[in-house]
Curated annotation (Swiss-Prot):
Gene source species: Geotalea daltonii (strain DSM 22248 / JCM 15807 / FRC-32)
Protein name (Swiss-Prot/TrEMBL): D-aminoacyl-tRNA deacylase
UniProt subunit comment: Homodimer.
Classification via HAMAP family: Deacylase_Dtd
Protein family: Belongs to the DTD family.
Motif (Gly-cisPro motif, important for rejection of L-amino acids): 137-138
GO MF entries: D-tyrosyl-tRNA(Tyr) deacylase activity; Gly-tRNA(Ala) deacylase activity; Ser(Gly)-tRNA(Ala) hydrolase activity; tRNA binding
Comment text on domains: A Gly-cisPro motif from one monomer fits into the active site of the other monomer to allow specific chiral rejection of L-amino acids.
Signal peptide region: none
Length: 150
């Protein structure tokens, strides 16, 4: 499971011109689910994102988490994060989870964040979405869940 997380002062996702999710201060998460990902991956990622200290304290140091600031989270599924661009000029999505599995884990991830007390807004799975944001900083991180040891 891969996530691009961005600290935002606001973010919105639209489908067919209609706003389907919007947050103020918080984190925008672009989430990609890969073959072999399980609920344990979503658990790890949710815990990491909610507690990652990427917000500034009064001294200007990144010392506060999403939980600390009582921020919001906008979750957008993005299967292209599972794309492999190492060969040729067209990305391969062979490592992307099948849609049914990906949607299940995407919804599970959103539920875990909600259970932790963070307000969650989301896009629509498999929809063509338009995402707008004000990246605060800018602060952007790429997270990848640990792979299972063979």
């Amino acid at each position: 499971m891969k996530a691009v997380i961005q600290r935002v002062s606001e973010a919105t996702v639209r489908v067919d011109g209609k706003k389907v999710g919007s947050i103020e201060r918080g984190v925008l998460v672009l989430l990609g689910v890969e073959k072999g990902d399980e609920t344990r991956n979503a658990d790890w990622l949710a815990e990491k994102i909610v507690n990652l200290r990427i917000f500034e304290d009064d001294g200007g140091k990144m010392n506060l988490s999403l939980m600390d600031i009582k921020g919001e989270l906008l979750s957008v599924s993005q299967f292209t994060l599972a794309g492999n661009c190492s060969k040729g000029r067209r990305p391969s999505f062979d490592t992307a989870a099948p849609p049914e599995d990906a949607n299940h884990l995407y919804q599970y991830f959103n539920g875990k964040i909600w259970e932790m007390g963070i307000p969650v807004q989301s896009g629509i799975f498999q929809a063509d979405m338009k995402v707008s944001l004000i990246n605060d900083g800018p602060v952007t991180f790429i997270l990848e869940t640990p792979k299972r040891e063979p």
